Amino acid sequence: DVYKRQILSLSNKEKPNICFIPTATGDNDSYKVNYYDVFTKFNCNPTHIDFFKRTIDLSSHIPEQDIIFVGGGNTKSMLAVWKDWGLDELLRDAYENGTVMSGVSAGAICWFEKGITDSWAHDLAVMDCLGFVNGICCPHYDEEPARRPFVEKVLKDNLIDHCLSVEGNCALHVKNDIPHRAINFGKNKNSYNATLVNGEVLEEAFERIDL
């Protein structure tokens, strides 16, 4: 719950409106129950958006939100649904008007130009995302054994020129489109900018705060 409190604090509102979007799991019910269990403990107004049940009026709901919180799951399927409903453009408008955009896994990479995803069962892939924030992002950097070698491979193949690589139990706070700092809520976890220098991967850790 520590990082969720941190997300709420970024709104600078006493009682922020926060909206959970669990599209990447097909609007999984237990995910929504967990969300409300956590956020009803805090001083906020939690809501959510379904796309696989009857969907609320997005054009009126999104502009009212101080924070958007996106769950993990299948990034490719999530973005396809959002585009079909026009949510991508509504979120862009909200972002440009100062709404805090946040999320985990698929909900973290979706804001960037590109993300490293396991949406396809057979392999990791670099996929285009919303492009609100410059850069390429990889979650689960230390949690899933295939992640670090894949980042090294796509760097060496010149498919990407850097990767904002985020370990488990860590968040990357992006401020004004620029990575601001890592937020560690685990045991000595960090986020890195991985680049290729003289043929070898260099991982530069971001400045970090510990919660």
Put a short name on every predicted segment:
Residues 177, 182-211:
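A conserved C-terminal secondary-structure "cap"
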